[in-house]
Structure formats: structure tokens, C-alpha cells
Amino acid sequence: MEWKVVDTVISPSTGVSFSCIHSLKNLRLTLWYQADVYMPPGSIIIPFNKGVLINDKLYPVTVYNVTRFNPVLWKSLKENSHCPGNCNPKPEACSYPFECLVSVCPFGLTRNIQIDNKKV
């Protein structure tokens, strides 16, 4: 089944991405998955047994949970993610003040923050 990504939120404190996806049958779900893969809004995704096709390219994805879309939960996810990349317009550098658990920034933001004398 083909799905369209409506919106995606990255959580730097957990390393989890949340995507609101919509099917042609008017079903809306929230997908919780490892943030190593970014599903940008407008992308077409198709689930496969070894991952997901995102705009016709296969990516391995670790899915943690799939739930019916809940607008109240989605609003809370957006308000509490604190990832600067989730903002519009996107900043030039990451200003997240804590260690980010996303291995590679999907927004391409660089970090100039040190925690305990270690650049994170």
C-alpha cells in the first residue's frame, strides 16, 4: 500500500522520528521509527519486509510503533521535540542544548555545542 508523508518530527532526546502518513483510503497513521532515516513531508512511501521505499529508493527502517493519528498527540510531539530542524524557517546551525541522539542530522545542521568539554 502506498502512503504519503504529511509531516515528520524528529526527537533529538530519543533519536526517534515520528511521521504522520496518509493512505489513498483516507487512513491516517503515526509512524514511530529510528531517526537514521528521514521521511520528508510529501514523500511517497511503500512498506517492504526489509525496509521502506521512500520515493522509489529502499531504506532499512526500524519501526517502533504505528498508531492511529491523534491530533492532540501530534501537537504535543511537535511542541516537545525541541529539534531546531523541525522549525520553519530552518536555522543554519543546530542550537539543541543537549546531546542529540540522532546519529546524522537529517537537516544537515552542524553543531557547535560542548557538553562536559566534549563537542556534541
Curated annotation (Swiss-Prot):
Superkingdom as given in the UniProt entry: Bacteria
GO cellular component: a single term: cytoplasm
Described function: Involved in the stabilization of the sigma stress factor RpoS.
UniProt-listed InterPro entries: Anti-adapter_IraM (IPR014448), PmrD_sf (IPR038679)
Protein name: Anti-adapter protein IraM
Keywords: Cytoplasm, Stress response
Intracellular or extracellular location(s): Cytoplasm
Family according to the record: Belongs to the IraM/RssC family.
Cytoplasm as UniProt keyword: yes
Matches recorded under Gene3D superfamilies: 2.40.50.650
HAMAP family, per database record: Anti_adapt_IraM
Primary subcellular site in the record, as a coarse category: cytoplasm
Entry's Gene Ontology BP terms: cellular response to starvation
Gene name, Swiss-Prot/TrEMBL: iraM
Organism: Salmonella choleraesuis (strain SC-B67)
